[in-house]
Amino acid sequence: MFPGRKASESAAGAFGTTVASVKWDQLVQGVELPFHPDLKVPALSEVLLPVPRPERIADVEQSAHATVVARLAGDVTPGMTVAVGGGSRGLTDRVLLLRGVISGLRALGAEPFVVPAMGSHGGAKAEGQRAMLESLGMTEEAIGAEIRATMETVEVARTEDGMPLYLDRHAARADRIFPVNRIKPHTCFKGPIESGVTKMAVVGFGKQPGAAQIHACGPEEMRNRILNGIEALRATGRILGGVGTIESASGEVVRVEALTATDVGGAAEIELTDFAREMVPALPFPQIDVLIVEKGGKDISGTTMDPNVTGRFSVHGLADLAEPDVSTIVLLNITPVSGGNALGIGFADFIPVSLAEQIDWQKTYVNCFTAGIAGVRRSRMPMVLPTEDDCIKAALSMCGRAFDQPKRVVRIESTLHMTRCWVSDALLQELPAGAEIVA
């Protein structure tokens, strides 16, 4: 800022000119581009993809109840208060899962209640986190337990190198905590344990300060802090255990496993993480010119779109995947459950006005800020164009392939739903074994 210059004048006229201020209203309307008159969007063929299809769990509630009772029978004393972690992710059958966990703990004599265990999500506000649970169907009536929400935290332990461990005030007052989460590869770091029960215990239950101190560092240190954190937290005796679920590429629950305190962050969770990696859906093409994603959101991935699928991590110190090599990404929508939080919008290159209008920048920036180095590039604004068709045409025009060459285009529902995709003719000869073109 130049001394004595108003904010609105800081750029305009800086060199004695009368340049108009930035026209933000142009983004609201969407910028129109001069597309080649002969540009056409290629026709796409629907393809069923070969993905792992383990047997789904038919009754998630009963499975959760049974595994809790079987694994934790000797660890619960009558009247033990247990803070059960409810997350912001769109777990399949999440209400049934929590209800089964609650009933299982009650059957053992515990007195469970639910706390939002989601770091800074929900705008880093207690009412926002409660609202996020409710938007996912996790109301007190549905899960059969009281929900206690607060952003106040209590330091309960420190790692050997001095990092504090936090629990929210309600969880800290309980006899034990019990994280319940989907286990899957993480979007910011790689290790023996990534996203799952351990991360919810160390990060989710720690609210804003717990999340901020983990995400403040790079990918390798992030992994180490989480692993060291669970050791320190376990040593306090505050962890009863947890429940981890694994979903297939089609979004069906295929495993529900209760973990003891020793299992959380231990061999059992490592085994579940290895299994979860096998379930991660993949784009079966080494090079893609245009990837069209119909919807992203916090219930799909913490980063709106899962970089383990798109190949783009956009984190300093963490390399993008060699395959798929995606030239341009078009994101068409975000889910209502996201509440406008669009962390990860920076993965996209083009978005329509209809999506841009949904973004709550307060929520997005708070979440990105808490994510530290992982949030810097992921909050960048893509090109905003009037319509979905404009976005796709822009991607086709700017993907780096000559105008008269066939484009390698893939369209998916989301990075979580990958049992099928739609591809252009240029990719039909590269379909993997077992893929089936839908007539």
Language-model-detected regions and their locations in the chain:
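An acidic, phosphate/nucleotide-engaging active-site surface
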Residues: 128-192
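Histidine-anchored nucleotide/phosphate-binding helix
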Residues: 92-112
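N-terminal amphipathic/basic leader segments beginning at the initiator methionine
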Residues: 2-62
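Glycine-rich phosphate/diphosphate-binding loops that line cofactor/substrate pockets in enzymes
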Residues: 67-83, 106-107, 284-285
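Active-site histidine-anchored catalytic micro-motif
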Residues: 95, 111-127, 158
